[in-house]
Amino acid sequence: MKQHLPIFKSVAIGVLSMAFAACNLNIPPQDQFSDPDAIKTVSNARSLLASAYLAYPHEEYAFSLLGNDFVPTSLSIKDISSLHLYNWDDREISKLAPTLWQGYYNVIAQCDALLERMQAVETQGQTEGTERQAIIAEAKTLKALSYFQLLRVFAPAYDLNPDAPGIVLKTQLGIEDKPRASIRDVVAMIRRLLTEAVQTPHDPERNGWLSQTAVQYLLADLALYAGDNEAAITYGKSVLGKSNDAYFTPDGINSLWQSNSYPGRIFAFNIHTSYYAGIQSSAREGDYFCLNPQLDYVASDVRRASFVYP
């Protein structure tokens, strides 16, 4: 039997909104952070930021099952939990929803803790001053990304009713008892965070840190989400203006999936396990799910060799 290993996915996360609408909307308790006085140097601040990156939830496989990336195989019945999730079974979704909710808000809490402490960070020389500004920009971007994911997962689509309840917006570090803000207000908060972050020139050599280009990409993505096509084009051009033709060759596309940093990759989380490790039953039998044939690439598409494993 043919085995398919999707290496690239495109899932419209917003389709989960109806299923997750009834989940518990309590903000998780504030995590215990280090003594505020302990964050005095850019090195310590960078370490706390790295912890926030590591806390970011990675449920890409679950999103692919809920989306249209995969279709079942004859082995699907052997992984009944994943099959139930694929079929939008309430029992499985009720397990996933609180994990996502708490996970993204945990990242936001860590970013808030870091941003609160950045005023006390002392710098010596221009290099440390630049690094301090980069850390602040990255923390705001990671916070915005977490809010954006929460919005796409737990709220209705923007174009259905932007004034409908969206998610809870944090305004201070610690526990808060607040109602959900409107989708429109959440988008405004995300846009404000990204607009502040994009002002900081930042082009890290390693792809695991959010760069200024990543902020521009998120601004374009947010504009598309909110139906602001003109803004999406403007920010999209800023990103495309930094590309070159080599990024769109077979070698360039293949480089996106290598472990080393690559200038054609806008951003990638540092992870230690494969997103899709759970799809395989065994090397001999094959996979529980296979790539949706409707998402296949024609032979002339340079992405085919890297995105689909025959």
Where are these regions (language model features)?
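Conserved, well-structured interaction surfaces
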Residues: S81-V153, Q199-D203
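Inward-facing hydrophobic residues that define packing positions of alpha-helical scaffold repeats
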Residues: I108-C111, V187, L194, G236
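Membrane-proximal, proline-rich intrinsically disordered regions
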Residues: A22-L66, R304-V308
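Short coil/linker segments at helix-helix boundaries
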Residues: T127-R132, V153-A188
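Hydrophobic-face positions in mid-chain alpha helices that act as interaction patches
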Residues: I233-P310
